[in-house]
Each structure stands twice: as C-alpha cells, then as structure tokens.
UniProtKB/Swiss-Prot annotation, chains A, B, C:
Keywords: Repeat, Riboflavin biosynthesis, Transferase. It comes from Bacillus amyloliquefaciens. GO terms for molecular function: riboflavin synthase activity. This is Riboflavin synthase. Catalyzes the dismutation of two molecules of 6,7-dimethyl-8-ribityllumazine, resulting in the formation of riboflavin and 5-amino-6-(D-ribitylamino)uracil. Signal peptide: none annotated. GO terms for biological process: riboflavin biosynthetic process. It is an enzyme of class 2 (transferase). Pathway: Cofactor biosynthesis; riboflavin biosynthesis; riboflavin from 2-hydroxy-3-oxobutyl phosphate and 5-amino-6-(D-ribitylamino)uracil: step 2/2. Lumazine-binding repeats lie at residues 1-96, 97-193.
C-alpha cells in the first residue's frame, strides 16, 4: 500500500531480460536505508518485491503480466525512476490509497505551464477513464495527482513545481508514456454499481415495472 | 492488523481438539523472537492470540467459528503454516490492509508456470467474489496477492518466485484448500453501496417522485 | 493511536465531578511504569490525557462532551477499567487502528458461552452500525473485536477466554453499557462514498435518462 508521494528518483543500473520477464537493478539512497528482502517498493508506481540489495542499490523481479501492462519496456540503463517505499504503519491516512497495481499506460499529449502549475493532458483508454471522477485521484508514474479535466479518452492533471522537481515529471515530454493507476475506491464502486445495474437491467424497466409501481 | 507479507513458515507441533474448538502448538523462530502473551499472529492468514510460548514455539486457541470458516481442520502434525506478526508501528504496508478475519476458503483448480511467475486459479463462492475487483488485492493463506483474473466463481492470482519460496504456496497442489480474506476496502464499499441501494429502492417510485423530478 | 489490545485493568480510586466535566484517579501498575504528563492512555477505549501521576496511579481530565458520549458516568470508586497506552514506535498493531474517539455506547443484550468462546450481542444505534461490515473490526470498551453478526441495530462479537480474563469483559452482564468505536477505515470510506453520492445525485433524473431507457 502506498500514498503516491514519491520519496526519491533512482537510476536504472541494469536491466536483465529473460523471456517475457525482467530483473531491474536500481541505484537509490533513501529507499535502501532500511530495505529488507521481500520489501515492496513502488517503481514508477508499480509495486515490486525486493529480491536483493547492497549499499546503494536494490534488485526487483518483474512478471510478464506487469512488463506487458506498464511502461517498463521503455526504460534503459541510466533512466530515472520514481521510488516510494510501502506506507509506514504510523503514516498518515493520505487522501488516496495506492496499491501499486498499475491499470494501464497513457500518452502525454499536451504540457502547458500556467502561473505556478503545469498542466498535462494524458490520452488513455475509456476502460480506465470510466472509473474516474472529476477532482478525484489518479496515480501517474506513482505520483498521486488530482483530476482537473476528464473526458472519455483523456485526463488533465496539474502538477506543482515541487513535485515536478522531485519526480521524473521533469524528464517527460509530449509523447512520453506514463503508468496509470486509477483510484481504488472508484474501481470498486464502478464494479459494484455495474454488477447491481447488470442484475437490475436484466430486469429492464418494462411496462410491467411501471404497473408494479402503480402507474 | 497485518499486511500479507509472510515472515516465515512454521511447523505444527501439536493439535489439541476440545469439542469444536482447537489449540495449536507451532514451532517458529522469527515470530517468537519478541513474542508476548496476548500478541496477535496470523497463521495461514487467520489472526490468532498467543496464549503460551517457549523458546521456539507458541500456542494459540482457535474458536469454533474460526475452525468452521477456515482450512485449519486440514492441518496435522508436521504441516507447514504461513506466519506473520501484527504490523509493527514502524513497519510498512508492503501488501495491503489485512485484518486476519478470514472470509472463507477456496480450492486451487489450476497452477500454471509462465516465465518467472506462477498463476493460480482459485474456485470460490460468489459471496466472496462480489466484493473483489480486477487488479485489486486478496489475501491467500495470509499472502497479499494481486487479482489478475476475476469471474463470479473464480479468481486468478499470480505469485513471484520469491513469494513461492518463502511461503506454503510451495506445498500447494491442484485441489488444495486455501484461506481467503477479501480486501477490507472492497467489503466496506460493497456494504455501503448496497445499504444505499436498499434505502433508495425502499422509496418505491411514487407519483410524488415523478413530480419532484418535473414529470 | 491505539490498537485495542488491553494491557491491564486498573481501578478507579477517585472521581471528582465539576459541573459536566470530571477528573478520574486510576490505580495501575503497567501503564504507569513509563508514564509522563500529557501521555495518552485509553480508559475503556476513551483516549484521555494524563494530567498527574504518582507511583501506582494517574489522573485524567474528562471533557463534558466525552462524559456525555460514553459510559464513564456509570463508574464509581472501585470500578475496574480497561487500560492501554498509545502505540509505541516499536509496538505492534495486534488489533486494528483505534483512535480512542468513542462513537457512542451500546447495551449488552445477550451473553452466550459456546465451547471456548463467549458471544455478546450489543444493541446500538443504526448511526453506528451503518459504517460496520461483517468480519470487520469494532472496539468494545477499548477491546479490538471481530464482528460475527450484524443487523441495523445490533452487532455480535465473540471473545476468547484469554481476552475475557485480561479485561473488564469479565465484569459485564446483560444490561451493561459499553463504549463503542467503529473502525476508522469504515468511517473514512462511508464518508467518502456519501460525498461522491451527493455530487452524483445533484445530476437530477432528466428527460434524457428516460429516453436512454427507451421511454
């Protein structure tokens, strides 16, 4: 469980591909300070398990399913990545539960600086936008962001200078691919609501429905 | 409160059945290192209270309700079990919010190795799947897992080699029974949504309802 | 933050009432071992601030609001109370997240011993049950408990012998009043869902809604 507050940006030291899976070695200082085997660390928003570590670097295994559903394939030696350790038990209940299970990717289609904020338009599938809500939360490469604009195929988020300087947002350009996790609560509500609708709409609003209700 | 990151596997030393309840004596080293009477330890995902301990073993009481709702009845002397101590205040939520209150059991119906991941199909009741969501979390024998496939009667989780080697997943086969805890967040939202649906549908659609909405 | 694992039962030495507020002096040994002015101690699940202490006793002030919302008024000299210190940095969440902010009281309406567990039916307001969920957590007089039964106006919890012997559950009878705190995660999600419902229901049922449904 994470909160979407990036702790530091690390650097890819090595990428070992074996068939469809991958092992990443990442240089970092803060998240390795108390690391142990089996710990969970979010790498660009993807929850990965630490399988090895030394002073200032750690290694993680990436399953085929995860490689396929994220932007990890676009990484190379020297790439910068957002890093966050799992939420600490005495941490604050942030406004946003992030599981680190990425739902898909999006493409940056517009970057616009307005006063002290930068607006990013992200093109993404309706499968993802359907569970989102205006002013709701979305995680972009592990960064918890607020949704300022929303349509069937795009989302607009606005990022403050501090977040840009502390994350890989600073390395992004129009055309960049980012990992997207939709807010957990929205996903649950969408599924429950549509399962109920499904059961209800199997009983479509028919003439009989009205007569049952005395019309 | 747990997080679904198993700390070690212990071994059943003795099982004492009294009527419908049970007392288990479990050999372990890591979770007994700082154990105290009254501590909570998750045994195959079930939160149990320590009622006795010595150097490398501890004893727990199991209520009839818990014996009935879980796979504990299938254990025997020498069985391996997953163990996790309650979240430490300075610990991290490497998995998700796990209460240790098991919701039911599931049967493993398929095990498939794909590259560096192993996929498990679990057959379980619609009463449990109704509160789950794709890419959501589920606890299997105390192991925090990601839902990669979901239907009314089954869930597919994928487990990385590290987790398999560190837990009793390594002892499981098709037909094995596992304990399931559904994600707490999903259960809450499901109940709230259906209570709201219930209150809404109790207000049958009346003449007044239509006029209020301008028809 | 507490976790609902009672450390010891203390004894009321003195109760000083001033208008609607109250000062309690409580005899205890364990929780006074490292006590300091300003520390938080949960008394029957109520987070109170230590305003004075000597070897084996401490004093706390109780605000009118807290006196009104809890069962403290029912205490007298010699009454036993459940005590728990705030989570220490190296403590463990053996129960669940407990804030010590009591939501209300409940009346015990049934006590039934079944094998090695005792079941308690608690009558409480729908305002409290609405945020609860089956197999979820609830705090009863500061004791973290699992919800085994739930209806609009009642909750059933089951308590193991160890917990009964270590807490004031042993002094309770049918008719006793207990303090209730509902699970923090449930309250948080309930509020979040109803805020979202409010935003949705502002979009009244329009002509379009009906034409979409074929009318």
């Amino acid at each position: 469980m994470f909160t979407g507050i990036v702790e530091e940006t690390g650097t890819i030291q090595a990428i070992k591909k074996t068939g469809l899976s991958m092992a990443l070695t990442i240089a970092a200082s803060k998240v390795t300070s108390d690391v142990r085997l089996g710990d969970s660390i979010a790498v660009n928003g993807i929850c990965l398990t630490v399988t090895g570590f030394s002073d200032n670097q750690f290694t993680v295994d990436v399953m085929p399913e995860t490689v396929k559903a994220t932007s990890l394939n676009g990484l190379s030696k020297g790439s910068k990545v957002n890093l966050e350790r799992a939420m600490s038990a005495n941490g604050r209940f942030g406004g946003h539960f992030v599981s680190g299970h990425v739902d898909g990717t999006a493409e940056i289609t517009r970057i616009e600086k307005k006063s002290n904020a930068v607006y990013y338009d992200l093109k993404l599938s309706p499968e993802l936008t359907k569970t989102l809500v205006l002013k709701g939360s979305i995680t972009v490469d592990g960064v918890s962001s607020t949704i300022f604009g929303l349509s069937d195929e795009s989302v607009t988020v606005s990022v403050i200078p501090h977040t840009i300087s502390e994350t890989i947002f600073r390395t992004k350009a129009v055309g960049s691919i980012v990992n997207i996790e939709c807010d957990m609560i929205g996903k649950y509500l969408y599924r429950f609501l549509h399962k109920t609708e499904q059961t209800k709409s199997n009983q479509t609003i028919t003439e009989a429905f009205f007569s049952e209700n005395g019309f």
